[in-house]
Regions:
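Metallo-beta-lactamase
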Residues: 3, 93, 98-156, 165
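Active-site neighborhood of phospho(di)ester-bond hydrolases with catalytic His/Asp-centered motifs
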Residues: 42-46, 65-73, 97, 170-173, ...
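Short acidic, glycine/proline-enriched helix-loop-strand junctions
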Residues: 266-297
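A short helix->loop->beta-strand "cap" motif at the edges of active sites that frequently abuts
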Residues: 90-93, 252-257, 287-289
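Metal-dependent phosphodiesterase/nuclease catalytic metal-binding core
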Residues: 31-35, 130-260, 271-276, 284, ...
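Active-site metal-binding motif and surrounding structural segment of the metallo-beta-lactamase
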Residues: 47-96
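Extended recognition/assembly regions associated with phosphoester-bond processing machinery
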Residues: 4-5, 61, 147, 292, ...
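Conserved beta-strand hairpin/beta-sheet module of binuclear metal-dependent hydrolase folds
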Residues: 2-60, 158-178
Length: 310
């Protein structure tokens, strides 16, 4: 297998789903490994980071990792207190994420390991830990260049655009793509024809702005938590319907799309049905976008012409 790849360790949103009916796609919360030779970028620290940490300890090949957090909702950080390398001397761990409190990123991480929520605090970490808050400019994480961008989700939340070896991977696990446009549609009846034309222009402008971060990406890993029916009931919760995610990736000129952050209530049968419906949506748009659902242990090479599951 290539030494430059994307591997999924956790693909669920909201909370872990360790159920027999969910094992084909997996039940861990978000964690995506970006292996770049002897360097490692980890997107988010949901429960999927726990088995990843155990594997890193067993392999003993890498001692320097970059953990890149989208935000601090439980499902994106709940595995970090169990990431074994953090407790081992000789490891260097760079942690990146938005600054949502006066104490910054370090404060956000420390809070979840304080009593009465956890038996030991971050002071028990023996690795060399450093904290970084991305700004408007791109930053380097080992051999990769990353750019943070804000997304539509409760609280301060980032997505990331990663470039390596001539390929671009976009990671946006929690992002409601069509909230503003759907809200405009709800109130169209209140306006006359001239105002409706202005609203349509606003919608198009908002749509283009909302998909700019995934423009021409080789691979987009994006929130697709809901079916259309569930999205109607949960609009404003900060997650996307898979239809909106597919349409946005196509409009942005992305080459491949990985539907991510599966609802923990969706079992394997439901996700198989969504996969078939997603294929139909891509076909209806008459595009060659490669679209697939994230699964735990799914691996995608940077070194292939197209970034597709192996």
């Amino acid at each position: 297998m290539t030494n430059n790849y994307v591997r999924f360790w956790g693909v669920r949103g909201s909370y872990p789903a360790p159920f027999k009916t969910h094992m084909v796609y997996g039940g861990n919360t978000p964690c995506v490994e970006i292996r770049l030779g002897k360097e490692l970028v980890i997107f988010d620290a949901g429960t999927g980071i726990i088995p990843l940490g155990n594997q890193l300890m067993a392999q003993d090949e890498i001692r320097h990792v970059h953990i890149v957090l989208s935000h601090y909702h439980w499902d994106h950080i709940q595995g970090l207190p169990y990431f074994v390398p953090a407790f081992v001397p000789g490891w260097k761990i760079n942690i990146y994420g938005p600054a949502e409190s006066p104490g910054g990123l370090a404060h956000q991480i420390a809070q979840q390991m304080k009593a009465p929520y956890f038996p030991v605090e971050v002071e028990t970490w023996l690795a060399d830990i450093s904290y970084h808050t991305p700004g408007a400019k791109p930053f380097d994480a080992g051999a990769a260049k990353l750019q943070a961008f804000p997304v539509h989700h409760p609280g301060i939340t980032f997505g990331y655009r990663l470039e390596f070896g001539g390929k671009t991977v976009v990671y946006a696990p929690d992002n409601e793509l069509q909230f503003i446009n759907q809200s405009i549609d709800d109130r169209k009846a209140e306006f006359d024809d001239e105002e409706k034309a202005l609203l349509e222009a606003m919608k198009e402008e908002q749509h283009l702005k909302g998909i700019a971060f995934m423009a021409n990406a080789d691979m987009v890993i994006h929130d697709a938590q809901y079916t259309p029916a569930d999205y109607k009931r949960k609009r404003g919760w900060g997650h996307s319907c898979y239809i909106d995610t597919i349409d946005s990736a196509i409009d942005a000129g992305a080459d491949s799309l990985c539907l991510f952050s599966h609802d923990p209530n969706y079992n394997d049968v439901t996700l198989d049905e969504i996969a078939a419906l997603a294929d139909a949506q891509v076909e209806s748009r008459e595009t060659d976008l490669a679209c697939y659902l994230a699964r735990e242990d799914m691996t995608i090479s940077f070194d292939s012409d197209r970034m597709l599951p192996e």
